[in-house]
Amino acid sequence: MSRCGHLDATVTEHRIGGAPAFMRGLRALFVTDVHILPNTTQAELDALVERIAAASPRLLLLGGDYSDFPKDCERFFRALGRLDFPLGAYGVLGNNDAEAWEGHLKLLRKTMSQAGCKLLVNASVDIPLAGGRLRVGGVDEYRYGNVHMNQRWSDVHFGNLYRILLSHYPVLPEDRPDLMLCGHTHGGQFNLLGLTPYALGFERFGKPHRASAAISGLHDIGGMKLLVSKGIGASRLQLRVGVRPEINLLLFD
């Protein structure tokens, strides 16, 4: 049993095999479901940011659910803004962000931008690398949003292209990337001998044929790699049983 504390998050390494030559050696960090709360201390926030920095990522990817409270979301991004990521920082919305910032998405976008992080809502960016390019896309969240990726995302006529898709929910896209990064599930949050609320039908994602059965870990689905992170916090019940908070270090080889 562990509380959802930002001091408790471990760094889980994942080797992403089969990457093209221009992606090999890249260190990227995926952080999701941070859930900063009013009672999250500055020491906890600083410890989390230091852990992110210690992983030495060139690229930071964020999976949403930063906080239920705009002021605490701003605290998180102010702290994150102290760090520098050579290839940039990109994030998507979670359902809690959509609720907290309803009608004020421009302010969230500005808050993230001031920290050097770009919010992707059904959009993508291309990052040039030596010998190829990395495309990072992000979809709107599924509960309140309208998911439809832009045409640029699907344009794969460039040579030497690797695509990473950020989605808060583990709902499989029709146009599948090389790697998909998701959160939301908190790894089940309660795991008793392999039994989680999701195994009991707690929540369903989208159309059945597109919903991933995975609630945590790295998986291969028809050639697409899918990582569902356990994330760090929780929005209401601040407790985890059998599920350790994590941030995810991606090592491409």
Language model: regions and residue ranges:
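Conserved beta-sheet core of the metallophosphoesterase superfamily
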Residues: 170-248
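N-terminal membrane-anchoring alpha-helices
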Residues: 1-22
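Binuclear metal-dependent hydrolase catalytic cores centered on His/Asp/Glu-rich metal-binding motifs
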Residues: 101, 106-117, 129-171, 240-241
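Short, well-ordered beta-strand micro-motif
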Residues: 15-17, 126-128, 218-220, 249-253
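Active-site neighborhood of phospho(di)ester-bond hydrolases with catalytic His/Asp-centered motifs
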Residues: 31-32, 59-65, 88-95, 120-123, ...
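Active-site-proximal beta-strand elements of phosphoester/diester hydrolases
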Residues: 25-35, 133-142, 164-168, 225-231
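Solvent-exposed loop/turn segments at secondary-structure junctions
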Residues: 66-69, 95-99, 125-127, 141-144, ...
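Membrane-embedded segments
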Residues: 22-118
